[in-house]
């Protein structure tokens, strides 16, 4: 976009007067932020309209996801428009601090972890590549939650990102639809977010649905002074789009989750079919020619019976014809190997919440059951295993595979595990459906925006083509032995570490040494991700430093960031444990110059943008075979952190691309775990035979550490010692500790370390979401570039 200072100033002043009745000189940073956002939208409005018009005439991909973890929009949009520097300078000239303005923006509370961040990266890549694609989700009023720590325990408070509205969401009341449930109906009101591509005029759309009641107020009841019941319908309807992943440990929580899923899927499909009919009328057999729908995990899989409902019940298409359309339209991304995360719904609950959808699901089940009987007449076990409805449970992953034309895993190892184990029956039946699409990240946010110093230096060395083609980074390999380049890469890392130090000092009152090793594990808290292994090693290291104060040791800061699901007690206990150990270590003068532990409160995209560029070590230590892919590992790699990890998920491909000698790989492989399980794993063996491990594990119950009487440490101890150590924390401890000591020693060799950093950056090209999206476009969706 061409930047015209006078036009921007004129438009900004116009917006400030229009919205706040203030001049540019009087405006607060919040008012400037809002006016700046509206100014951006006014300048892209025509391009946005023209993009929609262009896409309406071609095949489009629609990405259905329960979360989109977008991060702040202002800075990212200005960068993608190519006017970030100009806007900063323009604001500074008139005495406005751009950083203060940017800090007025709340992180949109539309996601939680890797699933949502992947979806956000995909939106950026679709727009940048001029591909006709649109996202659909829910406009959560209160998101997942804001995390606070009280006595080291996680406390959840609602996110309030919409308390003053959102400048980037445009309400579209003309596209409102009605969604029907078993016990009534709700209004689905859409809001559109512009997704601005980098270096292009194309502006894609993320459409978010907000739930509203059809009757906000029962006036008769209100006039009887029964105020609570007078607004009951309004409250129940609005609950649907109130929070992401409501606690589902009760039946009411489960019902709300199912209502959420059906709400956003039904609204989205009604919208998609309405727009299809505007162009193609009732030629429904053309749907697969013009519509591709991607199901991001199992949350939106209810879309399969919902599209059947629309086609059969509303449009009068014959069942057999509708089913042919459906299975050519949908594709499904599997994101997990964990059985617990392959969503299942109890028949009674499903029947109550969406009775017609249950009937259709049952019809699909019966149809497939008959097919299975013909395919495997002599294998009743296989027939039973593959049925969509088993006993009283509906298997959504099975419904997804049966109703989709493509099924993809998200890393090479993950896809192989799906084909060989978890989904073996399905792969044998439908080998042509299965393919791999290794996840990716957008380099625009995770390098260009997050690490401008490194981005500028890379551009100085090899030009800026990498911004749209990350494989260009390979050219950096010519500098691997150039000490001037290695010095600069090292110094940029120190600079980013100092920025993080300052941020943590301001926000959490913690002082850390920027010259220490920054060893970072930031991700959702789950037992399989093994934050427990990390903190056990830290506690053991502390004990060693206490026993041997003269031990040769490079100062190290261990940085954690994680949210635990509100109902996940063990995960919350591990957060307490990390903070318990941190309090002991950080308060001990004997180790204060050597060791520090920091738990970053309320980890989110804006904080991640400060952490990834500052990290020396990327902790990717999940139990081998449990992590589907991961994308944090890619963000760390792109910013020059070295991976300390198991051969799991995308770690396998990172080690392959950069060379295993440039990472720190430890622990059992998938085949080692298989062999150990076959032999019989007894956690008491490492507990009794690995030096120092018994002392660490027993600290959970011997009074060395305190859970403040909650009993959760004893629960964790029991999971390890009496319930089989399911994630092999104790078995992998010794190799993990040994690898940590190797890192500590090798960090002292500055040039060797910097060379490994540069090798990682240079080989991060594969992990761009641009590459991933092009593969989806060509091999799954069959969509083509549609540049305006």
Regions from the PLM with identified roles:
Residues 1-788:
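A conserved ligand/cofactor-binding region detector
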């Amino acid at each position: 976009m061409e930047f015209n200072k006078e036009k921007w100033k004129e438009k900004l002043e116009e917006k400030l007067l229009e919205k706040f009745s203030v001049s540019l000189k009087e405006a607060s940073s919040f008012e400037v932020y809002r006016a700046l956002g509206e100014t951006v939208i006014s300048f892209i409005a025509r391009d946005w309209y023209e993009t929609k018009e262009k896409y309406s005439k071609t095949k489009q991909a629609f990405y259905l996801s329960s979360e989109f973890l977008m991060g702040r929009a202002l800075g990212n949009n200005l960068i993608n428009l190519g006017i970030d520097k100009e806007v900063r300078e323009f604001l500074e000239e008139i005495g406005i601090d751009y950083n203060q303005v940017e800090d007025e923006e709340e992180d949109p509370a539309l996601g939680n972890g890797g699933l949502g961040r992947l979806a956000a990266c995909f939106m950026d890549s679709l727009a940048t590549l001029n591909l006709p694609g649109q996202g659909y989700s829910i406009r959560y009023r209160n998101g997942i939650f804001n995390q606070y720590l009280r006595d080291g325990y996680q406390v959840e408070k609602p996110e309030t990102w919409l308390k003053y509205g959102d400048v980037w969401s445009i309400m579209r009341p003309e596209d409102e639809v009605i969604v029907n449930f078993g016990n009534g109906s709700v209004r689905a009101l859409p809001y559109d977010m512009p997704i601005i591509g980098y270096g292009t005029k194309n502006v894609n759309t993320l459409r978010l649905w907000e739930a509203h009641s059809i009757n906000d107020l029962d006036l008769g009841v209100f006039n009887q002074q029964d105020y609570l019941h007078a607004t009951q319908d309004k409250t129940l309807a609005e609950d649907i789009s109130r929070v992401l992943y409501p606690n589902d440990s009760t039946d009411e929580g489960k019902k709300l989750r199912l209502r959420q899923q059906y709400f956003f899927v039904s609204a989205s499909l009604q919208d998609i079919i309405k727009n299809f009919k505007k162009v193609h009328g009732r030629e429904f057999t053309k749907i697969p020619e013009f519509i591709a729908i991607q199901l991001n995990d199992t949350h939106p899989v209810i879309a399969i019976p919902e599209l059947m409902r629309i086609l059969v019940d509303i449009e009068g298409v014959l069942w057999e014809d509708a089913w042919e359309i459906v299975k050519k339209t949908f594709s499904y991304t599997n994101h997990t190997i964990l059985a617990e995360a392959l969503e299942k719904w109890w028949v009674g609950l499903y029947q109550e919440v969406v009775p017609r959808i249950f009937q259709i699901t049952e019809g699909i089940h019966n149809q497939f059951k008959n097919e299975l009987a013909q395919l495997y007449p002599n294998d009743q076990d296989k027939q039973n295993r593959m049925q969509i409805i088993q006993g009283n449970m509906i298997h959504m992953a099975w419904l997804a595979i049966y109703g989709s034309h493509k099924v993809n895993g998200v890393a090479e190892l993950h896809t192989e595990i799906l084909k060989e184990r978890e989904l073996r029956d399905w792969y044998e039946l439908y080998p042509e459906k299965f393919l791999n699409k290794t996840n990716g990240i957008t380099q625009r946010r995770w390098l260009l925006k997050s690490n401008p110093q490194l981005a500028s230096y890379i551009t100085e060395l090899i030009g800026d083509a990498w911004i749209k083609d990350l494989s260009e980074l390979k050219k950096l390999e010519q500098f691997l032995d150039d000490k001037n380049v290695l010095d600069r890469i090292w110094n940029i890392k120190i600079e980013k570490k100092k920025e993080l130090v300052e941020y943590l000092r301001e926000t959490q009152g913690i002082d850390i040494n920027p010259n220490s090793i920054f060893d970072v594990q930031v991700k959702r808290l789950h037992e399989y991700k093994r934050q427990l292994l990390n903190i056990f090693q830290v506690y053991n290291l502390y004990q060693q430093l206490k026993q041997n104060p003269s031990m040769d040791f490079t100062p190290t800061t261990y940085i954690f960031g994680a949210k635990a699901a509100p109902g996940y007690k063990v995960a919350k206990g591990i957060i307490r444990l990390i903070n318990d150990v941190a309090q002991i270590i950080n308060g001990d003068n004997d180790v204060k110059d050597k060791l520090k532990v920091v738990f970053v409160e309320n980890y989110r995209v804006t904080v991640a943008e400060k952490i990834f560029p500052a990290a020396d070590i990327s902790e990717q230590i999940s139990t081998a075979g449990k992590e589907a892919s991961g994308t944090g590992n890619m963000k760390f790699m792109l910013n020059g952190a070295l991976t300390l990890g198991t051969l799991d998920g995308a770690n396998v491909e990172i080690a392959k691309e950069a060379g295993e000698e440039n990472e720190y790989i430890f622990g059992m492989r998938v085949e080692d775990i298989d062999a150990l399980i076959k032999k019989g794993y007894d956690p008491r063996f490492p507990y009794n035979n690995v030096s120092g491990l018994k002392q660490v594990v027993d600290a959970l119950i011997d009074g060395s550490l305190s859970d403040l009487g909650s009993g959760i440490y004893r629960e964790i101890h029991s999971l390890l010692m009496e319930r089989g150590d399911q994630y092999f924390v104790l078995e992998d401890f010794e190799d993990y500790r040994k690898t940590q000591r190797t890192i500590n020693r090798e960090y002292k060799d500055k040039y060797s370390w910097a060379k490994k950093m540069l090798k990682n950056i240079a080989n991060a090209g594969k992990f761009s979401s641009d590459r991933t999206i092009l593969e989806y476009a060509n091999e799954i969706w069959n969509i083509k570039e549609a540049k305006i």
